């Protein structure tokens, strides 16, 4: 079995330096073009495609695979950044952002890196059980 993971293309929040987390922002034109370019080069012979239900991931998916039959799964949704969601990254110190990146700090109301690891690992195990 071959498994390919594709991250969503550039979103408006990526471009603007805003914490997205679970916010349902759209791709930029640059992001859509990048995903379409990937779609021109990637093999499209897949048995199954899974996708996060967020708008930016769906837009990336359909730019690459316009007619994809897809299973949406909340377990592969982006990490919740709690109170940081929809705020400018520059509002937080570099040190605090680095601690978050390393999984040593969780924003108030946010999801721990351990929680993300568990739900994503559960997803991967389920997929491998189903197709192995």
Question: Each PLM stretch: what is its role?
Answer:
Residues 1-4:
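Extreme N-terminal starter segment of soluble prokaryotic enzymes
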Residues 6-68, 95, 109-115:
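Active-site-proximal alpha-helix that buttresses catalytic centers in soluble enzyme cores
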Residues 23, 126-127:
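A short hydrophobic/aromatic micro-motif that marks alpha-helical segments and, especially, helix-coil
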Residues 42-45, 127-132:
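Glycine-rich phosphate-binding loop signature in dinucleotide/nucleotide-binding domains
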Residues 64-121:
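Phosphate-handling substructures
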Residues 35, 120-124:
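Short amphipathic alpha-helical/adjacent loop interface patches that line ligand
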């Amino acid at each position: 079995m071959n498994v390919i993971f594709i991250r969503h293309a550039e979103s408006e929040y990526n471009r603007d330096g805003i914490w997205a987390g679970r916010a349902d922002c759209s791709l930029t034109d640059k992001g859509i073009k990048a995903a379409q370019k990937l779609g021109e080069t990637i093999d499209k012979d897949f048995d199954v495609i899974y996708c996060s239900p967020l708008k930016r991931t769906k837009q990336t998916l359909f730019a690459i695979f316009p007619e994809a039959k897809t299973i949406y799964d909340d377990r592969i949704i982006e990490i919740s950044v709690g109170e940081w969601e929809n705020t400018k990254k520059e509002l937080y110190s570099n040190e605090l952002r680095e601690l978050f990146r390393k999984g040593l700090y969780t924003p108030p109301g946010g999801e721990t890196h351990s929680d993300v690891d568990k739900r994503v690992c559960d997803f991967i195990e389920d997929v491998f059980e189903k197709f192995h």
